[in-house]
């Protein structure tokens, strides 16, 4: 590619042709990734009969405007069979609507690890049993699929409202303590699926049920591994001068996750740990990470640290944006001392808040309505009226910023009825306003007509 095109303006066809010629491979079907809209889905179905293991792969892609029917994509799928024989990684090229992988001469059904290293940007429809996901979590040598297995196990516990299995907790403990695994990978693996992603996995969204179940799973993870989180926090300190390299960054990420988990577990000394880290930090990651723990868990040093942070960085607009956003996205305390919305209303009166500044508006209003789903989605009209009032106010200041905020209720019809009624009322309230910008009017009408 560089030999042919260095210094030139080239097309996607030029790029693909260079790859094809270099590898002596026909990639004409692969170009459908450029010409067909949408994300392909691949359904995986398994069978194991009389020593023969068969995987049936079926690809599809939903209709999009102007493209009702899609031709099969060229989908490269890396896979490995975990079990007898320790099968090596292989590449399967899915080029037809349906194809099969067949392996004979086996005595036991293997565990399939597919789309390894995220070899294709697809949605994989594959309902593996929890026992097999646990095997992937413990034994797979592919980091992506190991992470994916953990995410699926976490998600099932959250959506089914059940605690984490004892065997899963033991496996997670072993992973956390494993010295051969990268700290950054551990940080990603232990981060639970976001509430917004969980919304996409259910037919009817009950935001408070999802929020509560997610909190409970994280609390179990924190308490069951409290000693291990303390070990992780102590083991991944980065003394000396600040280093921006990947290894140091990974240690900081895992250390801050460990601090968060210690707070969630109720560890008695976490207030002092977080306060000390905040005061001694020589980098923003550690200082902000400690501040986030103090604020999210309403620890005793939270207010003093917030004031100190503001005083220290008040001349740096981007950092003060983070300061506002942290308070707007504060998690709902189990004790529910004060609503986050009340915090946001109080912060609106802060001398550094200016709703006419797009970044500042996003750091507070958007952060609360779009990034703090557990606090925003309440079965009452209050938070939705707050949202509507700010969409209207921003409509007269910056229609583009208002239109982005207006999308917070795009999926209102998928929510439980006791939320829907208040969402619809808020949407209709906006739609009746005069002088709505075309940007905002389009978003609101599209939502109401969906």
Residue ranges and their predicted role:
Residues 35-36, 75-77, 124-126, 192:
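Generic structural "secondary-structure junction" signal
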Residues 1-4, 10-40:
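Catalytic cores of secreted or luminal carbohydrate-active enzymes
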Residues 26-29, 39-115:
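Beta-strand-rich binding/interaction modules
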Residues 2, 104-450:
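Long, ordered, helix-rich scaffold segments
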Residues 26-35, 88, 123-126, 199-201:
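Short, charged, low-hydrophobicity "junction" segments
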Residues 19-20, 44, 294:
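Alpha-helix C-terminal capping segments
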Residues 8-16, 40-46, 286, 319-321, ...:
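Short amphipathic alpha-helical segments at helix boundaries and their inter-helical linkers
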């Amino acid at each position: 590619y560089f030999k042919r095109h260095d210094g030139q303006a080239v097309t996607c066809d030029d790029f693909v042709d260079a790859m094809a010629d270099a590898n002596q491979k026909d990639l004409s079907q692969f170009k459908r990734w450029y010409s067909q809209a949408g994300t392909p889905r691949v359904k995986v179905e398994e069978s194991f009969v009389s020593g023969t293991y068969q995987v049936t792969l079926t690809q599809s892609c939903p209709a999009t405007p102007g493209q009702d029917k899609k031709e099969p994509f060229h989908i490269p799928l890396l896979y490995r069979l975990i079990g007898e024989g320790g099968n090596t990684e292989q590449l399967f090229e899915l080029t037809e609507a349906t194809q099969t992988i067949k392996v004979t001469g086996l005595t036991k059904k293997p565990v399939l690890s597919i789309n390894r290293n995220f070899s294709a940007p697809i949605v994989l429809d594959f309902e593996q049993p929890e026992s097999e996901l646990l095997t992937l979590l413990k034994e797979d040598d592919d980091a992506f699929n190991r992470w994916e297995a953990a995410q699926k196990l976490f998600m099932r516990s959250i959506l089914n409202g059940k605690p984490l299995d004892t065997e899963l907790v033991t496996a997670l403990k072993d992973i956390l303590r494993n010295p051969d695994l990268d700290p950054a990978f551990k940080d990603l693996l232990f981060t639970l699926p976001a509430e917004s992603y969980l919304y996409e996995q259910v037919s009817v969204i009950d935001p408070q049920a999802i929020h509560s179940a997610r909190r409970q799973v994280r609390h179990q993870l924190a308490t069951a591994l409290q000693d291990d989180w303390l070990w992780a926090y102590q083991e991944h300190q980065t003394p000396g001068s600040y280093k921006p390299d990947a290894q140091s960054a990974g240690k900081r990420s895992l250390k801050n996750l460990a601090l968060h988990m210690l707070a969630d577990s109720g560890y008695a000394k976490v207030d002092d740990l977080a306060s000390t880290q905040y005061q001694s930090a020589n980098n923003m990651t550690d200082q902000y990470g400690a501040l986030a723990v103090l604020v999210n868990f309403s620890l005793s040093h939270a207010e003093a640290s917030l004031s100190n942070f503001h005083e220290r960085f008040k001349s740096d607009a981007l950092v003060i944006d983070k300061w506002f956003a942290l308070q707007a996205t504060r998690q709902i305390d189990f004790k529910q001392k004060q609503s986050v919305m009340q915090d946001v209303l109080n912060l609106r009166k802060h001398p550094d808040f200016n709703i006419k500044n797009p970044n500042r508006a996003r750091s507070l209003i958007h952060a609360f309505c779009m990034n703090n789903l557990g606090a925003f989605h309440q079965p009452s009209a209050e938070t939705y009226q707050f949202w509507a009032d700010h969409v209207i106010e921003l409509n007269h200041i910056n229609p583009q910023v208002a239109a982005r905020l207006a999308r917070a209720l795009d999926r209102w019809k998928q929510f439980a009825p006791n939320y829907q009624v208040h969402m619809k009322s808020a949407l209709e309230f906006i739609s009746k306003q005069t002088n709505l910008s075309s940007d905002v009017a389009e978003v609101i009408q599209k939502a109401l007509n969906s």
